[in-house]
UniProtKB/Swiss-Prot annotation:
Name of the protein described by the UniProt record: Omega-theraphotoxin-Hhn1e
Gene Ontology CC, one term: extracellular region
Organism: Cyriopagopus hainanus
Domain notes: The presence of a 'disulfide through disulfide knot' structurally defines this protein as a knottin.
Keyword Secreted: yes
Keywords: Disulfide bond, Ion channel impairing toxin, Knottin, Secreted, Signal, Toxin
Maturation propeptide residues: 22-50
Function, in words: Ion channel inhibitor.
Cysteines joined through disulfide linkages: C52-C66, C65-C78
Length: 86
């Protein structure tokens, strides 16, 4: 009877160790995924930084504005030039 109780307690202890190790591995995997998402987000933001200015972005000439934008005649910002494209 004592040996059965000992085996049961040993089994529960072993199960607790395995579960905690699995939980630690899961947390590490989650951290890696979050880091990858943050790095991807940072890279995406850097990729969006372009040499041209977006709508209502400050500019000094038409060449500073992105496609289909032009410099406003009175203000130094980019506005839509009235053209369309596919």
């Amino acid at each position: 009877m004592k040996s059965i109780v000992f085996v049961a307690l040993f089994g529960l202890a072993l199960l607790a160790v395995v579960c905690s190790a699995s939980e630690g591995a899961h947390k590490e995997l989650l951290k890696e995924v979050v880091r990858a998402m943050v790095v991807d987000k940072t890279d995406a933001v850097q990729a969006e930084e372009r040499e041209c200015r977006w709508y209502l972005g400050g500019c000094s000439q038409d060449g500073d504005c992105c496609k289909h934008l032009q410099r406003h005649s009175n203000y130094e910002w980019c506005i839509w030039d009235g053209t369309f494209s596919k």
